[in-house]
Every structure is written in C-alpha cells, then in structure tokens.
Amino acid sequence: DEPLKTDLVSPPVCGNYFVEVGEDCDCGSPATCRDSCCDAATCKLRQGAQCREGLCCDQCRFKGAGTECRAATDECDMADLCTGRSAECTDRFQRNGQPCQNNNG
C-alpha cells in the first residue's frame, strides 16, 4: 500500500518516489527516472502530458471519450468508458430498479 499524501509528515521532497502534496508525480532522481510523463527535476507532469497512469491514460494523454476501459462483468454491469477528460475509468452500472440477473441483481 502506498501512503496517503497527508500521512507523510516531513516536507515534500522531489525524487523520493512518493507523490506528496504539490507533486504530480515522483519517479526518483533525474538519473533514475524512467517515466516519460514525469519531469524528475520538478515532480510535475512534462509539458503536454495530461496523465501518467490510469486505465484512461495512454502515452501521457487521456484516451478519447467513449473508449472502453473495462468490459461489463455481467448483465447488471455496463462497459466502463473513458471521458476524455480524466485518466480514471469510472464505474457504470444499470440504474437502480433496472431488472437484471433474473430480477436478483
């Protein structure tokens, strides 16, 4: 488990592999960083980068709106789609009251 940003009590240190308050990313020192989306000297996303990880992030850019990021698991679930504005894959499901799984879902 990664610690929460708020769990770290010392001042933020760029290059310690922990994303702390004020940092977008932290991939270690400039000599060791292998993250093409992160500027290791500033712990900020590189110019033009929108994201660095997530099911809706591809090569430092958000995947297009409507791109499937997770398939439906059953008839009560729906395929999850990227918004084009976030690296997160939001969970979609049938609305409450919608019959599914032989009215057991």
UniProtKB/Swiss-Prot annotation:
Ranges for domain Disintegrin: 11-96
Cofactor: Zn(2+)
Disulfide bonds: 25-43, 27-38, 37-60, 51-57, 56-82, 69-89
Tissue: Expressed by the venom gland.
Main location class: secreted
Domain Peptidase M12B, residue spans: 1-3
A GO term for molecular function: metal ion binding
Chain positions listed as propeptide in the UniProt record: 99-105
Domain of life (superkingdom): Eukaryota
SMART domains per record: DISIN
Localization of this protein: Secreted
InterPro entries attached to this UniProt entry: Disintegrin_CS, Disintegrin_dom, Disintegrin_dom_sf
Cofactor note: Binds 1 zinc ion per subunit.
Assigned GO CC terms: extracellular region; plasma membrane
GO biological process, any: proteolysis
Sequence motif: D/ECD-tripeptide, positions: 75-77
Pfam family for this entry, one: Disintegrin
UniProt keyword Hydrolase present: yes
Keywords: Cell adhesion impairing toxin, Disulfide bond, Hemostasis impairing toxin, Hydrolase, Metal-binding, Metalloprotease, Platelet aggregation inhibiting toxin, Protease, Secreted, Toxin, Zinc, Zymogen
EC number: 3.4.24.-
Assigned protein family: Belongs to the venom metalloproteinase (M12B) family. P-III subfamily.
Subunit structure: Monomer.
Protein name as catalogued: Zinc metalloproteinase/disintegrin
